[in-house]
């Protein structure tokens, strides 16, 4: 079984944010323990005498809360160590996913979250289908989402996708309704937070500092980034983001990186 851990970045209701991102990591069940250990080792390396430290990328970058007294050089090293921990998981034990939703008059607030959820459910299902067809490896999937304002609605959406299908068709490989947890209680949801924040920085600010290390682990097939989706009203034939660019030139990530 693969467990897809998801968290969000950006405020879907805030007009100052042009994008809303839902992102995370699909982790093979036997790798979850080792990935959690890798994050625990990041804490042991930098804060060996502390109580469990919650890794949230945005406060780490900006120096908020616990991170206010931590030197910037240490905070930067922590983020890079977190990226290294995620990318250390051997393939096919992990695949990253993110949906960057460019907000519009009809696609903001709850609709933006619903579009992102539908996109990632579909792409996760495609990954599981591909593993079966290409490797004769029948795996089921389970979603674990960070608790938030829309998490109860997300349960309804995903159940609807399972029973009635998405706009692209039925989801055939999800084992159950989604489950929800606090990021404080789950290192794997902290990984999802890192992926979502890295994607938000790339699309909102053209800051590729975190995404550059994570992008190689996004789900892809024949050079096309299927794990990263850009939902926009602009012409995707000229968009130079990694998602759109790889569809025109497979194997290439484009100038943003």
Regions found by a protein language model. Give the residues of each.
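Phosphate-ester processing/binding pockets and catalytic centers
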Residues: 1-257
């Amino acid at each position: 079984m693969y467990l897809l851990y998801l968290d969000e970045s950006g405020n879907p209701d805030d007009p100052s944010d042009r994008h809303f991102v839902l992102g995370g990591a699909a982790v093979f069940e036997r790798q979850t323990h080792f990935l959690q250990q890798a994050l625990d080792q990041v804490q042991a390396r930098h804060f060996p005498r502390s109580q469990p430290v919650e890794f949230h990328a945005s406060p780490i970058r900006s120096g908020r809360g616990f991170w206010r007294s931590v030197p910037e050089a240490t905070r930067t090293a922590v983020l890079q160590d977190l990226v290294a921990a995620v990318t250390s998981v051997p393939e096919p034990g992990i695949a990253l996913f993110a949906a960057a939703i460019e907000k519009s008059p009809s696609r903001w607030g709850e609709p933006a979250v619903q579009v992102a959820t539908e996109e990632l459910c579909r792409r996760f299902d495609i990954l599981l289908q591909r593993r079966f067809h290409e490797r004769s490896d029948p795996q089921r999937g389970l979603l674990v989402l960070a608790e938030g304002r829309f998490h109860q609605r997300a349960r309804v959406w995903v159940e609807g996708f399972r029973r009635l299908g998405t706009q692209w068709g039925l989801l055939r490989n999800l084992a159950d309704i989604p489950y929800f947890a606090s990021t404080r209680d789950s290192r794997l949801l902290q990984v999802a937070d890192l992926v979502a924040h890295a994607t938000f920085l790339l699309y909102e600010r053209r800051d590729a500092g975190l995404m550059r290390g994570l992008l190689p682990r996004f789900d892809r097939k024949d050079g096309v980034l299927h794990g990263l989706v850009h939902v926009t009203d602009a012409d995707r034939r000229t968009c130079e983001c990694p998602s759109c660019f790889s569809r025109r030139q497979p194997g290439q990530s484009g100038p943003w990186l």
